[in-house]
Regions:
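General secondary-structure propensity
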Residues: 1-10
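Conserved ATP-binding subdomain of kinase catalytic cores across diverse folds
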Residues: 10-11, 15-29, 35-98, 103-228, ...
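Long, low-complexity segments enriched in small/aliphatic residues
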Residues: 190-276
Length: 480
């Protein structure tokens, strides 16, 4: 007797046929086009809409960070691009989306086994949806970053092409792998170093180019070494101060403001703040696995502060918590970030998770090769506000994209493309995706064409944003 199955399990040929059929309906060449819709929303208006739920005193800081360049503007413009992607061609091959897969949302961090991994690291906008959305967000970010760094048009095109080509080629590999092999696939420190050395070996026949690649490799290795030192003890040296024999978080407004200085902001007394913090901490612990909860219970919550992070997230409520284990030399910093409605939910089916913190945690666990053991979620004092929790620094490292030359950014594009494909292969169908993407370069050429056109649009939007600041429509505080 064959048991009834609640989940469909098509065979390899059926999965491959699905991908090839999608080519007929949505040719790969169709992804090259970008033209703003006649009823395209005002990009500045979309940002103003986001600002209504953000901390009023931090909104000008967000604007100031976005004003730095078209690249930083793009980092904060996920809502604008979500609106633009709606209506673009999609093949009907859905995956768990990062939702904001620009090149600065990739980075290094420690796995639970203490191995340094490279992966996506921001999931605030995660939602199931068309794989093309993440690929286009990633690829366009490489074009915009390349222009920001002063690359020639040819170099910008080559870098962007590499990101999409790497995605396509990696998906071809994942299509041949077993299900568990895909799930366990990861890019660790050794893989990154090997990729850099492989690039250096290829450049060896060209002495001038070889020197450039060697410098890029040295910079990459140095960044990885630096990541190893970024832990809670290092964070304590930067964010903590010893007062009356006990550590607390330093005050550096508006970037870091301890809760002891924010009582009036939230309309609470000191005792009410203390009670609220511990209630939140208990609620968060309840979302952890039993063994992880027991581990966390060995730490005492010592202090909490509001801390500004990133570009696009500025103005959403974000806090850090200082915890102490066996003694003052055993700290743990946790980050608590507000999780709002995904920018994609205006255009895609709503998340099955009503709690947006849980939505973020699920997306992160689905897409990352390994995730923080302290990932959890809570509701705020205002039950309409949702939060997710994670470690603040756990060997976290990021690439200095704005300092990269073409060789370095091309290598980075290769790594990011592979990583995004691996993340998509975990939740999507790599066989169907590979069958759709094909063996030739048509897909990446189309994505590179789209990225060039969208980078032009981003520059126009940045100009409109800058004009809104100059006119007084938006307030911006720069340099913070």
């Amino acid at each position: 007797m064959t048991p009834r199955r609640s989940v469909s399990h098509p065979n390899i040929e059926e999965r491959r046929a699905r991908g090839k059929a999608a080519r007929e309906l949505v040719p790969r060449s169709s992804h090259s086009a970008w033209k703003p819709a006649a009823d395209r929303p005002d990009p500045v208006g979309l940002l103003e809409e986001q600002n209504t739920t953000r901390e009023p005193d931090l909104v000008p800081v967000r604007h100031g960070r976005m004003l730095a360049s078209p690249f930083t503007f793009y980092r904060g413009a996920a809502k604008i691009m979500a609106a633009d992607l709606d209506g673009t061609p999609t093949a009907g091959l859905d995956v768990q989306l990062c939702g904001d897969a620009h090149l600065s949302n990739f980075g290094a961090f420690a796995s639970p086994e203490r191995r340094l991994l490279f992966d996506l690291n921001d999931f605030d906008e995660t939602l199931p949806g068309p794989f093309e959305y993440d690929v286009k967000r990633m690829a366009a970010s490489f074009t915009i970053a390349a222009r920001n760094n002063g690359f020639s048009a040819a170099d910008a095109h080559a870098v962007t092409l590499m990101s999409a080509a790497s995605y396509r080629k990696a998906m071809a590999d994942f299509a041949q792998m077993g299900t568990l092999d895909i799930w366990y696939a990861r890019m660790d420190e050794q893989d990154l170093v090997a990729a850099m050395r492989k690039a250096a070996a290829k450049a060896g026949k060209h002495p001038k180019r070889a020197k450039v690649v060697e410098r890029a490799e040295a910079t990459g290795v140095k960044a990885l070494e630096k990541a190893h030192s970024r832990d809670s003890l290092q964070a304590l040296s930067k964010l903590g101060e010893l007062v009356d024999g006990r550590y607390r978080i330093v005050s550096r407004p508006p970037i870091v403001v301890p809760m002891r200085e924010l009582q009036s902001t939230y309309g609470l007394s000191g005792d009410e703040v203390e009670q609220a913090l511990h209630e939140q901490f208990r609620a968060y612990r309840a979302t952890l696995r039993d063994d992880q909860r027991q581990l966390l219970e060995r730490f005492e919550l010592v202090d909490v502060a509001r801390k500004v992070v990133g570009v696009g997230s500025v103005g959403t409520r974000a806090f850090i918590g200082l915890l102490q284990g066996r003694d003052q030399g055993d700290p743990l910093f946790l980050q608590v970030k507000e999780a709002t409605r995904s920018v994609l939910e205006d255009y895609l089916p709503r998340s099955r998770y009503k709690q947006h913190g849980e939505r973020v945690v699920y997306g992160q666990r689905m897409m990352q090769a390994a995730s923080d053991i302290f990932l959890g979620w809570t509701k705020g004092l205002d039950v309409e506000r949702h939060f997710y929790w994670r470690q603040l620094r756990d060997m976290k490292g990021s690439a200095d994209v704005e300092a990269m030359i073409p060789t370095g950014l091309t290598l980075y594009a290769r790594v990011c493309g592979w990583t995004l494909a691996r993340a998509h292969a975990r939740s999507g169908d790599p066989v169907a995706l590979h069958a759709y993407l094909g063996k030739r370069d048509e897909f990446e050429q189309s994505i590179a064409d789209f990225s060039r056109s969208y980078a032009d649009q981003n520059e126009l939007d940045y100009g409109a944003f800058a004009a809104a600041v100059r006119s007084g429509r938006l307030e911006a505080v720069e340099g913070i």
